[in-house]
Amino acid sequence: RQLATNTPAINWSEFNFTFSPNSRQILATNSVKKINYLLSLDTPVTSQILTDVTDNLKTIYLDWQTQTETILATKLQSLPKAIQTLIATDSAQNIQFSSDDHKVLYLAKTDADLEANLITPPPARSTQTEHRHLQADHYYVYDLKDDTNFLIGSKNEILYPSWIPNTNNLTFVNQDNLKVIDYDGTNRQIIFAANFNHRLVVPWSSDKIIILTTPYPGASENLYSISIK
């Protein structure tokens, strides 16, 4: 489903898009024309009054940076200290919590062995094979309730990973395909194989993902939502 249509004055394929920390807004930037629009994804873009926010860019970026740093700092404190020291925190992309904050996707910054029983695990937990020997530059998911740790893949094959809201699944880009994977590293599937902008993939809900793509070869790029099951 197309989220924004072109108009005589606006061709969205000429814009770059940046999502806010909570993924509820998009900053659309046309660097050639030096125009910036802040779009809300809570209402259809076509019904919004577009206002150039170029004069407020510094404030917007500082606010988003503060939001990101505050959120990450707070959530990092919920992790066992043994994991905190192993996570690469130079980018928000490297550490992401699931919607319920019970699981964390993280990029290991060094080889290490993750000791067992960092927390007291419940009587019943996942029986999938764990990976507690960490390799640098590999993504893992740690379950804060079960004390389980699963390998997702190396950062060279897991590009732009993100949690799907209200699920235990992640999306990522691999070999020009948009894929989904369970938090325990199982059940990889391709959900979109056509041309799309790899840097703009945003899981919007448990059954919907926003991407920047073209409906057919030669058409202008635009924002679309795709349904997933």
PLM features: what roles do these ranges have?
Residues 1-229:
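Sequence signature of WD/YWTD-type beta-propeller architectures
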